Amino acid sequence: MPPYRSRTTTHGRNMAGARGLWRATGMKDEDFGKPIIAVVNSFTQFVPGHVHLKDLGQLVAREIESAGGVAKEFNTIAVDDGIAMGHDGMLYSLPSRELIADSVEYMVNAHCADAMVCISNCDKITPGMLMAALRLNIPVVFVSGGPMEAGKVVWEDSVKKLDLVDAMVAAADDHYTDEQVKAIERSACPTCGSCSGMFTANSMNCLTEALGLSLPGNGSTLATHADRKRLFVEAGHLIVDLARRYYEQDDESVLPRSIATFSAFENAMTLDIAMGGSTNTVLHLLAAAQEAEIDFTMADIDRLSRRVPVLCKVAPAVSSVHMEDVHHAGGIMGILGQLDNAGLLTTSIPTVHSETLAKALDHWDVTRTNSEMVHKFYSAAPGGVPTQVAFSQERRFDKVDTDREKGVIRSKEHAFSQDGGLAVLYGNLAEDGCIVKTAGVDDSILKFSGPARIFESQDSAVLGILNGKIKPGDIVLIRYEGPRGGPGMQEMLYPTSYLKSKGFGKACALITDGRFSGGSSGLSIGHVSPEAAEGGTIGLVREGDIIDIDIPNRKIHLAVDDATLAERRAEQDAAGWKPAEERKRKISTALKAYAAMATSAARGAVRKLPD
């Protein structure tokens, strides 16, 4: 049996000094020998998705100690992508994922912790902690802060649901008065929690359920609802049990790499495609798979995208449906149940809470079980009261939405689309692939051709859109915004929001080697690989070049002959792969260090050290 890692610092005469320090943290004689569990929190007052986590770490810690473990809490950083959006702050968002993963590794290995409970929530925090968990491969349970309630505003004598994107779109639309914009702004984000649609944060928290590393309901139970407290209480007890099974019973099946296997990654990506998740999840799953030493690639994502239907449409794809509605329909277990019915999942694999995913679905899928507890759990409703307090309300719907024909979650037979919610496109513009969230693309523009309007940065693209330089039929091309070229691979939520505000949501396309917010919709193609800074063809496009986009056939083509491209490449090699226009962008030492090691989006934008 493997010894408890913590014995390195708690046993033996030579560890008297270390034990003295442990005692100064509150440990007593009877604690030496118990599993030491790291409570990896991410509380910060900067981020609404994390503002309520301060007390939740201690809640988990108390449950760990009541179950016979020793809990030691620390915090990681957390960047709010919405606040960092639209300025140089966004350069730091994706690199923060690596910093979070490293900081978890540093703390856990430096102090020889035996296991972890990861309390995450927003965009880069869950992926960073996931990467660390698979890197360390010690028992872990994920429990996130939960989604925000959707905002509501009275508009033209009716109640309209809102989210963060509505505020951005309205602010750029001259048809809205200042008073209307303020009303939307004040109502869009009413509570603590991760932004209310199927944006990156909620997508990733949902995927932890499919990977088997979190409890049912983790991705969909509202941050404000009292039911969410149970997840934190159970996580504290569960992690002590997992630690004992591994260290005392030599049960390796509880380790994250035994749970998050290749099949589990397939399940997670299948879920992502079916629910129209954020394109950022592709980056994060690819990165996490590399930490787990699993050969899960863009080719696998392409393969899955061709056979998985869209079973659930959530904001930004459908403005009236938010995470609270997904939970009301049975949550992630409800979607996984329909995917299983369609034969699209591997359910023989374990989870942290069940022997197999199949057994978990039998217990938690509301269309399979008559359990009053399960149906009550998924009837949790929004409270409708602005608050930053977790577990502060107990409202419920009268019954769960089990309609799989016209409800929020559909069966394969009644899918929103038999074609998946994400697609990988290949062609001479993206030899290693690029990603489009097809769930947010109108059917009328699944095939699109138009002239490229070149912008060497997100900033210049925003100015171009707002100043009327884009017209219907154009393709906005933003380059040198990849992991290395940005650096940091900025999200392009403002350009897509402004195109929508100008009425071009179905009339233009946007292509970039950067990435998109989970809140983006429309014909938005990102993650173009190789990126411009790596010598990708996107760096050779000239103003007015025609680009052909064919989503049904998974193609993207720059209509320039090979000989001309070769001439341009020779010119660019001589000039250097850098933006044609100087950018007023201060690149710090920290960002330069990230850029020096960053790989392309096709590899998850992970760092690669020189040989």
Swiss-Prot record:
Obligatory cofactor(s):
[2Fe-2S] cluster; Mg(2+)
Q: Which organism is it from?
A: Brucella canis (strain ATCC 23365 / NCTC 10854 / RM-666)
Note the Pfam families from the entry: ILV_EDD_C (PF24877), ILVD_EDD_N (PF00920)
The record's Gene Ontology cellular component field reads: cytosol
Question: What is catalysed by this protein?
Answer: (2R)-2,3-dihydroxy-3-methylbutanoate = 3-methyl-2-oxobutanoate + H2O; (2R,3R)-2,3-dihydroxy-3-methylpentanoate = (S)-3-methyl-2-oxopentanoate + H2O
Q: What is this protein called?
A: Dihydroxy-acid dehydratase
Q: Which pathway does the UniProt entry assign to this protein? A: Amino-acid biosynthesis; L-isoleucine biosynthesis; L-isoleucine from 2-oxobutanoate: step 3/4; Amino-acid biosynthesis; L-valine biosynthesis; L-valine from pyruvate: step 3/4
Which sequence positions carry the modification called N6-carboxylysine? Answer: 124
The UniProt subunit note reads as follows: Homodimer.
Please indicate if the UniProt record lists Metal-binding as a keyword.
Answer: yes
